[in-house]
C-alpha cells in the first residue's frame, strides 16, 4: 500500500510499505495471515531497504495503574536491586520520557528522525507481571495486548506488535498466545528469561507446552530481561542493568540450550536483546564445558553453539567492531537492528552503527536493517 508520511515535522519523501495491515477480528486480517510471506525486500521510493526495529517498548499506563496498589517494585529485580541514586535517576527518566513511552505521535517523530520505518513494539519489560496470581496475570496480559493491537490497527504501516502472556500458568499462557496471534494479529510475544525467579526449564512450569505452541504458530519470541534475580552485588552504579541484564539473558538462554528446549522444539524464532548477552562474545566456554564434562551432556547431544546459532541477536553493542564480531560468528542473517527505544541504555543511531561496521557487504546490511526481521515478523508486500 502507498502512503504519504503525515507525521508532524517529517521531511522524508513518501514511503512505500506493501504489507498487510492486521486489524482485530476482520476478514481481511484472516486472509492476510494465510498469504505466504514474500521473500522480496520491501523498499521505499528512495530504493533503500526497509528498516525494522526489533527492540522497542511501549508502557501501558492503564495496566500499571491497575497493579499499582500491589507495589510491583518489590517483585522487580531492576528496582529491588538498585541503589537510592539509581532509583532516583530511573524515576526522572520515566518522567522525562513519559511521552516517548506512551504517546505514539511522539514515537513516530523519533522513528522518522532515527530512520526507522517499522517498530516491532513490545511491552515495557516489567509489564510481564509474572509475580501476579495467574488469573490477574492473564487479565493484565489481555489489557496490554489489546492496546498493542489498537496501535497496530491505527498505524498499520509503522508498527507490528509483540504481546505478553502469563507464563506463571502455562494453560493461560497458551490461551492468550493463541488469542494474540489469531484474533489480534500480533506477530509474537515478549517473555523474560525467568518466571519470577524460576528458570524457563523448571518442570513445575511445564513451559514445553508454550514453546510447542509458539513453534506451531510460527511466531517470534523476544526474550528481554528485567535485571538479574540475584542482584545483591549489582546494586551500585546501575550494574544490575549494565551487567545484570545481559547476565540474565545469558543464564536464561543457557537453560534453553542445556535444558533441551531448542532440541525439542527446532525452528523456534527466539530473539535475544543486547546482542545476546555475554554468550554472543564468550560462547566458546560453553562448548568446552560440553566436551569436557559429562554433566553438561545430560540432555543435549550436540555442542551448545549448534543451538546458539539458531537464536537471533539485536545490534545493541554500541561498538562497530563488537557488532562485526557478532556477525562473523553467527552470520548477518541472525542479526537484527534494535534500539531499546526509548530508554537511556538504548542505541540512538542504529542505522549509523550498522553503516560503520567494517567489511559489511550491502546484502548483509540489508538483512540486518530489516530483511530478516520482515521475514520473521511476516511483514508482507
Which ranges hold each PLM region?
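Mid-to-C-terminal alpha-helical segments outside catalytic/metal-binding sites
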Residues: 1-50, 54, 62-118, 146-154, ...
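Hydrophobic faces of well-ordered beta-strands that scaffold small-molecule active sites
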Residues: 52-56, 119-121, 160-163, 189-191, ...
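Catalytic metal-binding/acid-base residues of hydrolase active sites
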Residues: 57, 226-227, 276, 342
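Short acidic/glycine-rich loop or secondary-structure boundary segments that cap or lie
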Residues: 61, 231, 279-283, 288, ...
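Aromatic- and acidic-residue-enriched segments that line the glycan-binding/catalytic groove
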Residues: 63-76, 135-139, 177, 207, ...
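Active-site gating/metal-coordination segments in enzymes
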Residues: 117-259
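A general structural motif
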Residues: 250-253, 292-297, 315-319
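Aromatic-lined glycan-binding groove of carbohydrate-active enzymes
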Residues: 260-308
Amino acid at each position: 500500500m502507498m502512503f504519504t508520511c503525515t507525521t508532524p515535522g517529517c521531511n522524508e519523501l513518501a514511503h512505500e510499505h506493501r504489507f498487510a495491515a492486521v486489524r482485530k477480528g476482520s476478514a481481511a486480517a484472516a486472509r492476510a495471515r494465510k498469504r505466504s510471506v514474500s521473500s522480496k525486500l520491501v523498499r521505499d521510493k528512495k530504493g533503500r531497504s526497509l528498516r525494522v526495529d526489533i527492540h522497542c517498548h511501549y508502557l501501558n499506563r492503564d495496566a500499571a495503574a491497575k497493579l499499582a496498589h500491589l507495589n510491583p517494585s518489590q517483585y522487580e529485580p531492576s528496582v529491588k536491586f538498585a541503589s537510592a541514586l539509581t532509583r532516583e535517576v530511573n524515576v526522572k527518566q520515566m518522567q522525562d520520557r513519559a511521552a516517548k513511552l506512551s504517546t505514539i505521535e511522539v514515537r513516530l517523530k523519533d522513528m522518522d528522525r532515527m530512520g526507522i520505518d517499522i517498530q516491532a513494539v513490545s511491552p515495557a519489560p516489567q509489564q510481564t507481571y509474572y509475580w501476579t496470581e495467574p488469573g490477574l496475570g492473564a487479565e493484565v496480559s489481555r489489557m496490554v495486548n489489546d492496546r498493542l493491537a489498537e496501535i497496530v490497527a491505527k498505524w498499520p504501516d509503522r508498527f507490528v506488535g509483540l504481546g505478553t502472556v502469563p507464563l506463571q500458568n502455562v494453560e493461560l499462557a497458551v490461551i492468550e498466545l493463541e488469542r494474540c496471534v489469531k484474533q489480534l494479529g500480533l506477530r509474537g510475544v515478549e517473555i523474560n528469561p525467568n518466571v519470577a525467579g524460576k528458570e524457563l526449564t523448571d518442570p513445575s512450569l511445564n513451559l514445553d507446552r508454550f514453546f510447542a505452541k509458539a513453534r506451531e504458530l510460527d511466531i517470534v519470541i523476544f526474550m528481554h530481561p528485567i535485571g538479574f534475580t540475584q542482584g545483591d552485588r549489582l546494586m551500585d552504579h546501575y550494574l544490575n542493568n549494565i551487567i545484570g541484564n545481559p547476565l540474565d539473558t545469558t543464564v536464561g538462554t543457557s537453560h534453553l540450550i542445556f535444558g533441551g528446549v531448542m532440541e525439542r522444539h527446532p525452528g523456534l524464532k527466539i530473539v535475544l536483546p543486547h546482542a545476546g548477552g555475554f554468550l554472543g562474545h564468550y560462547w566458546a566456554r560453553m562448548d568446552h564445558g560440553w566436551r569436557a564434562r559429562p554433566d553438561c551432556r545430560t540432555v543435549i547431544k550436540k555442542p551448545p553453539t549448534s543451538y546458539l546459532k539458531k537464536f537471533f541477536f539485536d545490534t545493541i553493542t554500541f561498538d562497530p567492531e563488537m557488532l562485526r564480531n557478532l556477525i562473523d560468528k553467527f552470520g548477518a542473517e541472525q542479526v537484527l537492528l534494535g534500539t531499546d527505544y526509548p530508554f537511556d541504555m538504548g542505541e540512538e543511531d542504529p542505522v549509523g552503527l550498522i553503516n560503520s561496521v567494517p567489511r559489511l557487504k550491502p546484502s548483509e546490511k540489508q538483512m540486518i536493517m530489516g530483511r530478516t526481521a520482515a521475514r520473521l515478523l511476516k511483514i508482507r508486500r
